[in-house]
Amino acid sequence: MSGRSIHIFCGTGMGKTSAALGKGIREAGLGKSVILIQFLKEKQAEGSMDFFKRLEPEVRLFRFEKFPENYDCLTEREQEDEVRNIKNGLNFAKKVLAIGECDVLILDEILGLTEKGIVTIDEMRSLIDAVGDDTELFLTGNCRCEELWPYVDEVTELVTPYKKETNAE
């Protein structure tokens, strides 16, 4: 990678996180530093966390949510607490961009924060605007957030294919 670039991986299909992480790992292999911040994700299995620890210091993973359950399964009170934690994660992302702490920043499932009303499109735009000249930013999530498309370099929409069953003849 050379220069500033911003990518969105969106849609209802599987593989958005894998695609962004794959690009991040490729860049880490080229000597770049990568930060992955996860939002709205259930707590990962212990094996997944061990894998990410082996990628350090080139790839660093951060989660600010404290509850192991999916956000939608939390009580209203727990969701309020979790929103504060998520906002801390957003502030961390802003700081990472402001000081140029990494070459590649992956904000996993951040697009879903707009659907839940936790983050506005304007706040997302300010994150995009904060991307430095030599930073690559990946935004993932189910939400298409088409309002952001004019401000990014690449949009990849993943859709899980529908396979029509046919009767054997």
Per-region residue spans from a language model:
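Catalytic phosphate/metal-binding cores of nucleic-acid and nucleotide-processing enzymes, i.e., regions
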Residues: 2-5, 133
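Conserved P-loop
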Residues: 4-95
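Hydrophobic/aromatic ligand-binding patch that stacks against planar heteroaromatic rings
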Residues: 26, 51, 127, 147-148
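P-loop/Walker A phosphate-binding loop and immediately adjacent motor/lid segment at beta-alpha junctions
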Residues: 30, 128-129, 164-169
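Conserved nucleotide-binding/hydrolysis micro-motifs of P-loop NTPases
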Residues: 40-43, 67-68, 111-112, 143-146, ...
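Phosphate-binding/switch loop-helix module in NTP-utilizing enzymes
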Residues: 73-133
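Sensor-1/coupling segment of RecA-like P-loop NTPase cores
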Residues: 129-145
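Phosphate-binding/switch region of NTP-binding enzymes
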Residues: 142-169
